[in-house]
Every structure is written in C-alpha cells, then in structure tokens.
Amino acid sequence: MKLSMPRFDQAPVLVVGDVMLDRYWHGGTSRISPEAPVPVVKVEQIEDRPGGAANVALNIAALGAPASLVGVTGDDEAADSLANSLQGAGVRALFQRIKHQPTIVKLRVMSRHQQLLRIDFEEPFATDALALAAEVDALLDGIKVLVLSDYGKGALRNHQVLIAAARARGIPVLADPKGKDFSIYRGASLITPNLSEFETIVGGCADEHELVSKGAQLMHDLELGALLVTRGEHGMTLLRPDHPAMHLPARAREVFDVTGAGDTVISTLAAAIAAGEELPHAVGLANLAAGIVVGKLGTAAISAPELRRAIQREEGSERGVLSLDQLLLAIDDARAHNEKIVFTNGCFDILHAGHVTYLEQARAQGDRLIVAINDDASVSRLKGPGRPINSVDRRMAVLAGLGAVDWVISFPEGTPENLLSQVRPDVLVKGGDYSIDQVVGADIVGAYGGTVKVLGLVENSSTTAIVEKIRKTDKAE
C-alpha cells in the first residue's frame, strides 16, 4: 500500500472525552533513603503535558489539522496548565470546570529516563461533557470527524446521544473504548481497542483466525462500521464488513515508552479520515505514527514533518531518485530540521572524476544536494545525435549512488527554470567559467533571497572529450 501525506489543514476534528494532565517530575537518583529501601529522587524539573482526550487533540493539532476539545476538569491549577498548553498548540478547548473536585492528574517520577513511580490524583466526575451540549452541538456543524476518547473517568456518559448527533450530520464517529460494555459504542464508524480491551469483551483469541472471527461478530452485534485492534509488537488488525482482514506489522524501530500510543493511533486516523483518506490508507498512516511515538519518552505527539519522514522511509524516498511530489515532501522535512538545500543541474551523461569532485564541492555549500538532470530527449537536443550515451534511468541511478548526492530528479526542458521555481533551493550551484548573471535560474533564486555560486571545473575532465576519445579509438581499431 502506497502512503502519501494528507491535507491535514483541511481536516477539522472534534474530540470529546476524559481530559487529564500528565505531570512529570524529573530528577537525579544517587542514593537510597535511610527511612526505607527506596531511591531518593532530587527533583530538578517539573513538566506538564496534556493527557487522555487532551493528548488526542494535541496530536491532531500537531499534524496540522484544526482540533477542538470538549471535556470536564476541576477548577484548579492543573486545569489552567492544560488550558495554556492546548491554547499554545492551537487547540480550541472547552472545559466544564467543576468546583471542589480536582482535575485528573497522572504524576510520574522519572530518573535517567526511567519511570520510578506513578501517582494518580482522580475522582470520577459526576458531570459529563454534555453539560456543554449547546457548545458540542455548535462544534459538530463545523467538523468532519468526531472522536470519543473514553478513559472511563466520567466525561463520557451519553455516548449514544453524541453518536446519533454526529450520524445525523453524516459525520464519522471514532471511539477509543474502555470498560466491559462496548454496547455504548453501538453505531460508531470505527472503534480502536487494544488487544487486552478487545479480549475483555470477546474472550481470549488463540490465533489471528479467532481474532478475526470474534471481531466480525462484534461488528455485527454493535453495528460498527469497522474495528481496529491494536496489538503492540504484533502491529494492528483492521476488520470491515465484507472485506478481508488487513494485518499491519508494527513499525517501531525502538520502543522507549508506550504511554499515549493509543491516543496517537486514533488521532492520526481521525485527521486522515477528516482529510478524505480511505480507511486502509488512514490505518497505514496511524501504524507509522504509532511506530514513531513509542520511540519517545512519556506522553508525546508526533509532528507532520516526522510523519512525512516516516512515509518517505516507507516509500524509499529518504534519499535517491524521486518524483517531484516526493522531492517537495523531502524538502519540507529537511527545512523543518533547518537544513540548507543546494541545487545543481546538468546532463551527467558519462560520470567522471571531474563530476564527482564538483558534486562534493556543491554538497559542501549546504546540508542537502539535489541533482537535476536533463532527460534523454533534452540531452539529444542539447548535445546532438548519438547523445546521451547512457539513458536517463542509468544516469540517475549512478548519481544516486554517490555519497554527496541526496536526491536526483529529471526534467524534460532544456533548462531547469520550471523545476527551480517549485523547489526554491537555498543555494543554486553551477560549474564552469560563468558570471553569476549568466547562470540559468539565477534570477529566480535571487528573487526570493537565495544564493547563486559558481564553482570551477576540474581541468581535463569533460564528457565530450571522453566520448571523442572513445570514437577515435573505435575508428583506429
């Protein structure tokens, strides 16, 4: 399945559910307490992160999608911290604040990137999110997906009211379920239990065949549009009525912390579906996103550039020969990491030592080097009959194998102005005895503040000379 980056900026999502604050106390541990056989942690940093439904909304916003959140909190410092964090991330948050009851806080004591202790401050709320029914109703009119983020803490008590309101508007409903009664999610478009939550409802599954069979029955009984079971190191399984099961392997390279991984899955699904992606594609993106987030410590969100980079790895486009769409994504990601983009172009028909030296010098002008080459038809127009000696595919393959070259792309025109206008490199490099104003594309690059550099060529290194030498040798023989 080929993955691509959705237009998340056109994908508004509403999250309703259990809001909580994940608080971290970071410190050093060098001794055991004289009072009891426990480590002493000297707290050096206190960090607050949105958790639960707030983390789902944060993940959606981090992908670039408009995110709204409705939940229940106390009227306290923790709620203020949540509100400030969410506002800073661009999330529109509406809280029903309950006096004389604390906001749910999960406090984790950390030392040397290890969790030593977790302390929960919580009381189930008697008031649910529908205390803000008018606000929820108004928000539903401007969204494309509704997410129910259920942690069983009391903010979600009237699931069916929310599901019915969304379905009446044609809005898909995604639910991250909790508890022993999944009937409260009847009619949802998709639910995303982990394997343990799933088996709590349907019983143990000895193998994938049994998982698929029991999942199909659950979908039928609850009138679900689809079911996604997340299975940790075994990946995830998507079930849909009248479709074969879709099993996706886990994508994590390293696992540091699974905290919030389920939030990342449902948030990526929601944003992708809101952007118009088909469910299998959205699940593929969610699987990649989960692989990223478990490589981070604590409750974390993934950014759009991180997801783009994962897609590029998946499609083999982190380096090498790229299409224009792939190249533009790669450039966006590189710029998100403050990398300088260098561009050069040519025919590169027979690669020789002069080319290699020149490309190494070009690469030294920045962090990433794009080499754009004329396709076969344009080389023939420029160089005459019998050229190119090597086809465009072979020329690109050889260039892509050089350590100095990051990305290779071809263009059909005689000169690369059209490509330069789209790529907008930071530095345009040309080899030869030119003045800067003679370099093709210098005006384009200069207009947006880019730099043009002319590098000298290695003497006695010329493709034309090599071709002529070969021809003379052939005639002599």
Curated annotation (Swiss-Prot):
Residues holding ATP: N194, L195, S196, E197
Enzyme class: transferase
Keyword Nucleotidyltransferase annotated: yes
InterPro entries named in the record: Bifunc_HldE, Carboh/pur_kinase_PfkB_CS, Cyt_trans-like, PfkB_dom, RfaE_dom_I, RfaE_dom_II, Ribokinase-like, Rossmann-like_a/b/a_fold
Pathway, per record: Nucleotide-sugar biosynthesis; ADP-L-glycero-beta-D-manno-heptose biosynthesis; ADP-L-glycero-beta-D-manno-heptose from D-glycero-beta-D-manno-heptose 7-phosphate: step 1/4; Nucleotide-sugar biosynthesis; ADP-L-glycero-beta-D-manno-heptose biosynthesis; ADP-L-glycero-beta-D-manno-heptose from D-glycero-beta-D-manno-heptose 7-phosphate: step 3/4
UniProt catalytic activity: D-glycero-beta-D-manno-heptose 7-phosphate + ATP = D-glycero-beta-D-manno-heptose 1,7-bisphosphate + ADP + H(+); D-glycero-beta-D-manno-heptose 1-phosphate + ATP + H(+) = ADP-D-glycero-beta-D-manno-heptose + diphosphate
Listed GO MF terms: ATP binding; heptose 7-phosphate kinase activity; heptose-1-phosphate adenylyltransferase activity; phosphotransferase activity, alcohol group as acceptor
HAMAP family attached to this UniProt entry: HldE (MF_01603)
Membership in a protein family: In the N-terminal section; belongs to the carbohydrate kinase PfkB family.
The protein's name in its UniProt record: Bifunctional protein HldE
Record gene name: hldE
